[in-house]
Amino acid sequence: MKKEHIFVIILVVLIAGITTLAVVSNQKNNVDKNPVLSLALDKTAQCLVDGGAKFYGASWCSHCANQKALFKKSVKTLPYIECSTGGPGTPQTQVCIDAKIQSYPTWRFTDNTELSGEVSPLDLANKVSCSLDDTSIAELQIQKDELIAKQKSTQATQKSQSTTQD
């Protein structure tokens, strides 16, 4: 009887592991399955470079990692400037001190305006007047809507946790 239970447990764990692997693999390949989004992100990243935008962040910053993830494979084109000399609490790099960067991520534009926090690629494209076709705009809008839903979900979870702790 115990051998049967062990076999069932092993089988369940194996199936769960395979399912998890399939889901993660599908998420990583998602951009390849949507070439329109991939091209829109490529164009947006290049527009940011051409428009003189600067993306200040820190290697240890989770919001910076999320910002980069929004650009998928186009992340390598972003005008990224590393501000951290190490982990949290370490001094900023001189370029970020000179730029007076106070939070991460921070996007700075040639008109001396800035946006802080996770910003959708669509909002960044609009900020630098990037010319995108309607299909690209639609794909970036879907991505933005997903980002907003994720942020609202995170805020609701945090609010629920703080209420529970009170």
Q: Can you say where each PLM-predicted feature lies in the sequence?
A:
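Structural micro-motif
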Residues: 93-110
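Structural microenvironment flanking redox-active thiols in thiol-disulfide oxidoreductases
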Residues: 47, 85-95
